[in-house]
Amino acid sequence: MTISSPVIVALDYPDAAQALAMAQQLDPAKVRVKVGKEIFTRSGPAVVDSLHKLGFEVFLDLKFHDIPNTVAGAVAAAADMGVWMVNVHASGGQRMMEGAANAIANHAQRPHLIAVTVLTSMDDSDLQQVGVVDVPKVQVQRLAELAKASGMDGVVCSAQEAGLLKQACGAAFELVTPGIRPQGTAAGDQRRVLTPVQARDAGVDYMVIGRPITQSETPTDVVDTILRSLA
């Protein structure tokens, strides 16, 4: 099943039981779900399989970053798992990204292959500490253009950079954005945040939303409110 919703719910739980309990409260016709490092390390591919059985398309958010052969193998394994989207770190370089793209080029269920540019938790001072002298938007554009040249379908970026990246990389280049918070919710540990409407208007294709949905007493109502605001 392929859905048109831009909302991806981050199932950032320590174990599969909690993630699946939340997933059972959501509608796979309205949202996709994201599986990250902690739950995947604890539960492995079984959690992805369980989410598939519930009808969800899954974004496997493991941000692979290693030598080209290792990343290519990992991305191929993710494709074999049937995930809808998988990501790698753009800072791994062109050969690493090209290897990942080539590894799934002919896969029958090729997932969307996305590169991570600058983590949305990082600001100017964080970049300077790791030797990047440019401000985030400059580094993001540099890595996004490299990702496109390397065969990526799009990038993970902040919504603030979306307009710049659509102009630089084209309308078809997919932008996946965490740090999206519905109006009136806390920013949490994401430093560069926008509301869903602001993100949509900026050019974001897919919005990763976690705690505003998963920590709500009525997660389906929050999803419906977000989708209505985007209609």
UniProtKB/Swiss-Prot annotation:
One of the GO biological process terms: 'de novo' UMP biosynthetic process
EC numbers listed for it are: 4.1.1.23
On the tree of life, the source organism's domain of life is Bacteria
GO MF terms listed in the record are: orotidine-5'-phosphate decarboxylase activity
What reaction does this catalyse? orotidine 5'-phosphate + H(+) = UMP + CO2
Active site, UniProt feature = 63
Q: Which residues bind substrate?
A: 12, 34, 61-70, 120, 181, 190, 210-211
This protein is called Orotidine 5'-phosphate decarboxylase
Originating organism: Alcanivorax borkumensis (strain ATCC 700651 / DSM 11573 / NCIMB 13689 / SK2)
Q: What is the lineage of its organism?
A: Bacteria, Pseudomonadati, Pseudomonadota, Gammaproteobacteria, Oceanospirillales
